Amino acid sequence: MSRASLEKDPREVATMFDAVGKNYDITNTVLSFGQDRLWRKRTRRRLDLAPGDKVLDLAAGTGVSTEELAESGAYCVAADFSLGMLRAGSHRDVPMICADGLNLPFADNTFDAVTISYGLRNLVDFRAGLREMARVTKPGGKLAIAEFSTPVIPGFATVYKEYLMRALPAVAKVVSSNPESYVYLAESIRAWPDQEELAREIRANGWENVGWQNLTGGIVALHSGTKPLD
């Protein structure tokens, strides 16, 4: 797998995340200066879930995002391709399943909402992933995608890119069990579509009413949409 490329070997991606599962959550909190907690809350609020809703949290990792979603009273399922990540989150009180985001083990029109946080970028074919998420979502159901994006504050983008390519890998060497994975993280973020381009891709792959909210100056963009009724 070329680190700077969006072409990925799914086995390599799974192996990479298996290796970081144990310290994944605390590492992300350190590297994001605690902003990851805010981003999870914003995702839950955007979905506006109700008790009894069925929700799929795709690329859920250790399930920390699924726990946040479940605070709404909805029934939330954590799905991830990495067994290592799921094992690291096995203490969480949410149902977990090992699943391929391009071939989900669920019937059509199963969920009231589907969400994926910082995982769409890691799918071998993210467009196919968007269509697969639409398949398992009920007509009129909701989508939320939290993903690293392009800063919108003038001058900040340069500082952020410097952090991504220099500071983040250096800090990861101290706090992560697999710092190489954070080099991949930095390079994949740089290669990822910006907010408007990703919105176009979401619309073209099964979703409507697509919009986004920039979080922390656009470091993260929270895209949302709905599945058409027909």
UniProtKB/Swiss-Prot annotation:
Gene Ontology process terms (BP): menaquinone biosynthetic process; methylation
Its EC number(s): 2.1.1.163
Disulfide topology: none
Pathway: Quinol/quinone metabolism; menaquinone biosynthesis; menaquinol from 1,4-dihydroxy-2-naphthoate: step 2/2
Binding-site list for S-adenosyl-L-methionine: 62, 80, 100-101, 117
Broadest EC class assigned to this enzyme: transferase
An example Gene Ontology molecular-function term: demethylmenaquinone methyltransferase activity
UniProtKB keywords: Menaquinone biosynthesis, Methyltransferase, S-adenosyl-L-methionine, Transferase
The reaction(s) this protein catalyses: a 2-demethylmenaquinol + S-adenosyl-L-methionine = a menaquinol + S-adenosyl-L-homocysteine + H(+)
Pfam families recorded: Ubie_methyltran (PF01209)
InterPro entries referenced in this protein's UniProt entry, alphabetically: SAM-dependent_MTases_sf (IPR029063), UbiE/COQ5_MeTrFase (IPR004033), UbiE/COQ5_MeTrFase_CS (IPR023576)
Family recorded in the similarity comment: Belongs to the class I-like SAM-binding methyltransferase superfamily. MenG/UbiE family.
Annotated function: Methyltransferase required for the conversion of demethylmenaquinol (DMKH2) to menaquinol (MKH2).
Protein name: Demethylmenaquinone methyltransferase
Organism: Corynebacterium urealyticum (strain ATCC 43042 / DSM 7109)
